[in-house]
């Protein structure tokens, strides 16, 4: 055996079959091209192929079969194996693509197995509920795993997502003005869908009413704001799985950028802000506008409500605190370099002295009911602010503190690479999403970024939501939902 035969990784039989396949392909190719396009070279090419078969084919039977099939007098004979070589070549390419896909799927499954093993370890250490609320604290320390539990697809970009406070339902609002409700245990088709606006939905909020000493039945309210200048109020009818529109709120003269609904005693109010530079307070029961004030000189992009106070963030890069019943502006925060996308109050949590910003530092702040707030901006930062105490007087509306009316920035979180779109606070963690396609989890105690989800979406991440931890009517669950420009919502569940 020669040296080149030793290097060839084929047996004699395999080499003979390969040679026959090559010759059959050459024979087919010459029939298709040379005979029709280069007729003058026909005989010379045919003779060369026959000669080549004499060198390559070892068995005389194989040579005779090939010469017979190549005979010009036998035009009707077709060798079924003439295209065997190109077919095998194409099969190898398809097989390589399939192998790459299988390797990617295997990598994903291995990651899921690691996450599940981590969850099993956590469950093994999980303690049952005790009188001092041990399990509640464990729930608040939950950080979602790397991969979502389910993926929801809709027809256009997701602009806002909200979890039902009690049921495994997620509400999804889109850039085409559609509103969806999905069952998290059967999310292939929506429970309900509604064309709620003629233009994009910009914001959404939900509230499960808690009417006491009243004949009114409690139910879930869904409020949406839109670029069509309208605010729509819906009742979620659980028995029929549908949205029932209660009313529309009209009054803003430009895009309605954010909406918030809250309840105090048996009174339910809705707050909205707009590009017309105003903030409006609405009565939920009759739809009347109770108050309108202008806290900023430019587009008001975000609001949050705590009792009689509203915090607002604007295109003018500032955030302001306002006493909404009187319309008195109380204090202002400056420090962002670009427009503010989201603002939120940081609510106090009882019996959590170890969590920074979640307990009051003085009795005066405790009596007032708030001390800190957080803002997210297009300057890629998240800032936590201490709100100055206003001048509080009995039976009179609060007024600005003449010696201290400026927010004090106590912590700046840096890590996002583009506009920060939304934030949510649970326990000692702050979750944020941004146009850099990532979601981040921050530790409020240290200011460190604990976890980054970088491949949840292929476009901007516009919204996220977790259960609140400060409402006694809402039991926090280990769930998080995100919505993005790629028309997808990712849901994380334990």
From Swiss-Prot:
Gene Ontology CC terms, in alphabetical order: cytoplasm; microtubule; microtubule associated complex; spindle pole
Coiled-coil annotated spans: 90-123
Function per UniProt: Positively regulates the activity of the minus-end directed microtubule motor protein dynein. Plays a central role in positioning the mitotic spindle at the bud neck during cell division. Targets cytoplasmic dynein to microtubule plus ends, thereby promoting dynein-mediated microtubule sliding along the bud cortex and consequently the movement of the mitotic spindle to the bud neck.
Compartment(s) of residence: Cytoplasm, Cytoskeleton; Cytoplasm, Cytoskeleton, Spindle pole
SMART domains with a match to the protein in the record: WD40
Subunit: Self-associates. Interacts with NDL1 and dynein.
Domain notes from UniProt: Dimerization mediated by the LisH domain may be required to activate dynein.
Protein name: Nuclear distribution protein PAC1
A biological process from GO: establishment of mitotic spindle orientation
Domain of life: Eukaryota
GO molecular function: dynein complex binding
């Amino acid at each position: 055996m020669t040296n080149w035969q030793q290097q060839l990784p084929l047996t004699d039989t395999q080499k003979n079959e390969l040679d026959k396949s090559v010759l059959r392909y050459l024979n087919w190719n010459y029939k298709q091209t040379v005979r029709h396009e280069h007729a003058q070279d026909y005989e010379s090419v045919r003779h060369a192929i026959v000669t080549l078969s004499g060198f390559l084919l070892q068995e005389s039977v194989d040579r005779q079969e090939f010469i017979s099939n190549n005979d010009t007098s036998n035009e009707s004979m077709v060798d079924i194996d003439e295209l065997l070589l190109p077919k095998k070549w194409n099969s190898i390419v398809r097989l390589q693509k399939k192998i790459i896909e299988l390797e990617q799927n295997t990598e994903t499954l291995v990651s899921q197995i690691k996450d599940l093993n981590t969850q099993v370890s956590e469950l093994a250490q999980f303690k049952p509920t005790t009188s001092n609320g041990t399990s509640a604290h464990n729930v608040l320390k939950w950080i979602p795993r790397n991969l979502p539990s389910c993926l929801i697809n809709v027809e256009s970009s997701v602009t806002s997502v909200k979890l039902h406070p009690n049921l495994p339902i997620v509400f999804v609002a889109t850039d085409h003005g559609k509103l969806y409700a999905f069952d998290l245990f059967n999310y292939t088709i929506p429970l309900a869908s509604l064309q709620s606006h003629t233009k994009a939905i910009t914001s959404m909020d939900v509230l499960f009413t808690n009417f006491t000493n009243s004949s009114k039945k409690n139910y879930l309210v869904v409020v949406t704001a839109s670029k069509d200048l309208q605010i729509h109020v819906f009742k979620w009818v659980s028995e029929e799985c549908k949205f029932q529109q209660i009313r529309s709120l009209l009054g803003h003269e430009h895009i309605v950028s954010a909406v918030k609904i809250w309840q105090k005693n048996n009174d339910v109010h809705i707050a909205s802000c707009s590009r017309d530079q105003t903030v409006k307070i609405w009565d939920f029961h009759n739809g009347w506008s109770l108050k309108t004030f202008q806290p900023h000189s430019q587009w008001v992009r975000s609001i949050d409500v705590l009792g009689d106070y509203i915090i607002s963030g604007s295109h003018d890069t500032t955030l302001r605190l306002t006493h909404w019943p009187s319309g008195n502006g109380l204090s202002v925060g400056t420090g962002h370099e670009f427009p503010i996308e989201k603002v939120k109050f940081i609510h106090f949590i009882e019996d959590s002295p170890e969590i920074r910003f979640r307990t009051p530092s003085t009795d005066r702040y405790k009596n007032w009911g708030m001390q800190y707030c957080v803002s997210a901006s297009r300057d890629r930062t998240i800032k936590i602010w201490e709100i100055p105490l206003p001048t509080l007087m009995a039976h009179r509306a609060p007024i600005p503190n003449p010696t201290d009316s400026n927010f004090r920035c106590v912590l700046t979180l840096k890590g996002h690479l583009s506009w920060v779109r939304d934030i949510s606070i649970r326990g000692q963690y702050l979750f944020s999403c941004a146009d850099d396609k990532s979601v981040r989890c921050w530790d409020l105690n240290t200011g460190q970024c604990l976890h980054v989800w970088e491949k949840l979406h292929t476009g901007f991440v516009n919204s996220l939501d977790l259960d609140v931890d400060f409402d006694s009517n809402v039991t926090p669950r280990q769930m998080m939902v995100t919505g993005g420009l790629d028309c997808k919502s990712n849901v994380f569940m334990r």
